[in-house]
């Protein structure tokens, strides 16, 4: 007689091993990390007047933490550092791993 044991997942909702295996499936998926220095709004006229050497003022204050986004969702804040002659960011505040996964699954 055929059996379905091992084919279908348990419906009781208590499968911690399955949850770990599910997360292993997504661990190598690339995500986009963005560090945001600040934002501003401008008119089309102002945009068209920009030239090399133009300075655009942003809403972020000097010394204020920078927003760190993953796929457009805020997950942390940090400060600018230099790493081997390149910019980097030191994380100063971050949401929990479970909250990060929840935001990415939206």
From Swiss-Prot:
Which residue pairs form cystines in this protein? none
The protein's matches in InterPro entries, at most eight in alphabetical order, are given as: FliN, FliN-like_C, FliN/MopA/SpaO, FliN_T3SS_HrcQb, SpoA-like_sf
The record describes the protein's role as:
FliN is one of three proteins (FliG, FliN, FliM) that form the rotor-mounted switch complex (C ring), located at the base of the basal body. This complex interacts with the CheY and CheZ chemotaxis proteins, in addition to contacting components of the motor that determine the direction of flagellar rotation.
From which organism does this entry originate? Pectobacterium carotovorum subsp. carotovorum (Erwinia carotovora subsp. carotovora)
Cell membrane recorded as keyword: yes
Q: Provide the topology term for how it sits in the membrane.
A: Peripheral membrane protein
- Keywords annotated in UniProt: Bacterial flagellum, Cell inner membrane, Cell membrane, Chemotaxis, Flagellar rotation, Membrane
Tell me, what's a Pfam family for it? FliMN_C
Q: Looking at the record's lineage, which domain of life comes first?
A: Bacteria
Q: Which GO terms describe its cellular component?
A: bacterial-type flagellum basal body; plasma membrane
State where the protein is found: Cell inner membrane; Bacterial flagellum basal body
Query: SUPFAM superfamilies in the record, alphabetically?
Result: Surface presentation of antigens (SPOA)
Q: What is this protein called?
A: Flagellar motor switch protein FliN
- MF terms in GO: cytoskeletal motor activity
* Any single GO BP term: bacterial-type flagellum-dependent cell motility
Q: Which family does it belong to?
A: Belongs to the FliN/MopA/SpaO family.
């Amino acid at each position: 007689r055929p059996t379905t044991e091992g084919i279908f997942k348990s419906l009781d909702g208590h499968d911690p091993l399955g949850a770990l295996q599910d997360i292993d499936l997504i661990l190598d998926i690339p995500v986009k990390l963005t560090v945001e220095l600040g934002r501003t709004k401008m008119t089309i006229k102002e945009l068209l007047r920009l030239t090399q050497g133009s300075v655009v003022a942003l809403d972020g204050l000097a010394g204020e933490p920078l927003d760190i986004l993953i796929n457009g969702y805020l997950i942390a804040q940090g400060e600018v550092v230099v790493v081997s002659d390149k910019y980097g960011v030191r994380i100063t505040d971050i949401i929990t791993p479970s909250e990060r996964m929840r935001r990415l699954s939206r």
